[in-house]
A protein has these predicted regions:
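Amphipathic alpha-helical polymerization modules
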Residues: 1-187
Length: 187
């Protein structure tokens, strides 16, 4: 008889299919409709990539993640801004007291990769580029194959809990049937 070598997970693959959106009423929340990742300046000086667009302002007025990491390229909102507007092409403008028209303070740029599945998770919804992902192509939203930015929304998980629970129950039933088959064969 030959002894088995057991099983192990060879890899866990991330699936970057877009999730549903939920409206937040927060003008600093930004969802990406289509392909692309926000660029985030990490504390070690490297750039991380994320689709999590729940941003806030730090004490200097810069757009940052919930963990305080700066969005790249950096965008600073003036402290006296009355209104913040982000269009589908990533242009960020503010209305200031006494101004007759909004002022553009920056443009959000998105990164795309030849092979998104090659990105390596680093935690906190951040990923880093690898040889497998290729180098990022950076550009404005709605240019080339990049998605559009949507202000006041965040992207939800792309996993359907109900569907995954059904899959788990099916796997459990298959295991039980196979277990009974082996038990019957042993008797």
């Amino acid at each position: 008889a030959q002894l088995g070598l057991g099983v192990k997970t060879s890899s866990i693959q991330k699936i970057f299919i877009q999730g549903d959106f939920t409206q937040t009423q927060n003008p600093l929340d930004i969802a990406i409709q289509g392909k692309g990742f926000f660029q985030i300046s990490q504390s070690d000086g490297t750039i991380g990539y994320t689709r999590a667009g729940a941003f806030k302002l730090d004490n200097t007025g810069q757009l940052v993640t919930a963990d305080g990491l700066v969005l790249e390229p950096a965008i600073t909102i003036p402290t006296d801004a009355l209104d913040i507007s982000i269009d589908s092409q990533g242009s960020v403008s503010v209305t200031q007291p006494g101004a007759t028209a909004p002022t553009i303070v920056g443009t959000i740029q998105l990164a795309t990769f030849q092979n998104e599945a090659g990105l390596q998770a680093t935690g906190f919804n951040l990923f880093r580029q690898t040889d497998a992902s290729g180098t990022p192509t950076i550009g404005n939203p709605q240019s080339q194959d990049r998605g559009a930015t949507q202000q006041g929304f965040i992207e939800l998980s792309n996993v359907s809990v109900v569907e995954e629970l059904v899959n788990l129950i099916s796997a459990q039933r298959a295991y039980e049937v196979n277990s009974r088959t082996v038990q019957t064969a042993d008797e």
